[in-house]
Amino acid sequence: MTDETRAKVETVIKDLGYRVNVAARNLNRDHTGFITLAVPSLIPPYLAELANRTIEAARQRDYSVYVTTYAEGSAKGARDLLKNFNSTVSDGMILSMSEVEDISPEDLKVDFPLVIVGARTTWGVADHVTPDDVAAAATAAGYLYDRGSSRLAVVGARDDYDAAALLQAVEGNAQLRLRGVIEEMRRRGLELDPHLIGNTDQDWTIGAGARVTQRLIDSGVPFDGVIALNDQLAIGALTALRTAGYEVPAQVQVIGFDNNEEAPYLQIPLTTMDSRLDWTAPTAVNRILGRIDGSITKPELLTTESQVIARASTR
């Protein structure tokens, strides 16, 4: 095509307001150019950041992302999403599976590319991309002990404390993180005091962290370190401790998980375990695209270590 002809075509396109029909173009290529990211909700900061990082990682590979939630409003859950996946609008799914979803191995035996992210097991049926929560929690506990804490409280348990069951846990953020704390304490010849475990059920919000920490304070059982199982809980714990007159970190150290955006900007900047979303999102995208193009055929578990992001809530 000559430059003159190209200029004429571009003028006509502009005058007519023509836009490329991406869906139609991709049908001709035997793929849609889209992947689906399914999360329980976009309210938790961790999941919102997962979505943003997944979109960016996909964009770098010339893919777009449909983001959908399956645990809000009239949504019917992850199982329904898996059952009714539409391959004409998306080439595959990255699924962040909630701890409360009733999912079986059979549910994950699907006929489209699927990658699971997060702390739920896939029973070896599907690709699984997740940081090592057990190792991260052990690191967090060790970090507090090495800086002078001797009695640790944990904020964010889901169920009644059962050390034997927790040591066998293979899924669930709360269970795996508690397992890591217990393992690290036992390596040091210590036991976690059941009276210092704050149960928040499924509520991992700032308010829950504050309420449960206040209950621990009111119990009168002494503690000088708090492991909050996410940063929202940790922010609540910091609020309760300061309201009760405790000096952080001089009297009580606090560490969270996920390195949320607000963590560095609190009145007492929060020490936290890195969420490793910088690794999780691009790894999941690379994995799903490998499934789509056929270069990856066997399910794998892909994990990585987390590091302490040290700030003023610890010594």
Task: Label every model-predicted segment.
Residues 96, 117-119, 131, 155, ...:
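Generic beta-sheet signal
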Residues 37, 87-96, 153-156, 220-230, ...:
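Periplasmic-binding protein-like
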Residues 16, 87-89, 147-148, 216-222:
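Glycine-rich phosphate-binding loop signature in dinucleotide/nucleotide-binding domains
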Residues 66, 214-315:
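Flexible loop/turn connectors
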Residues 1-31, 315:
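N-terminal helix-turn-helix DNA-binding module of bacterial transcription factors
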Residues 22, 40-49, 68-76, 129-139, ...:
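Hinge/beta->alpha junction and helix N-cap segments in small-molecule ligand-binding domains
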Residues 22, 30-142, 146:
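Alpha-helical recognition/docking segments in bacterial nutrient-uptake
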